[in-house]
């Protein structure tokens, strides 16, 4: 890791930990209907974070189930594409 990146991460560590804690406190249990509003709130939270991170286009796509969050940043349309996939929901304690 470059020294500039290391310094940046270290200087923002508390903020990152706070944001991650905020994220983890949202009970986004996707398999239980009673948490549907929380799953949507979590999608909104995630969309806000990726907007703040500089994504150009951020969209929350509703589905019959839980919403998708899709974001992109096109730096150079001729450059290779990098895809990052993850999930923001959690599973119940006793699946």
What are these regions (language model features)?
Residues 2-95:
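Acidic/His- and Gly-rich active-site-bordering loop/insert found
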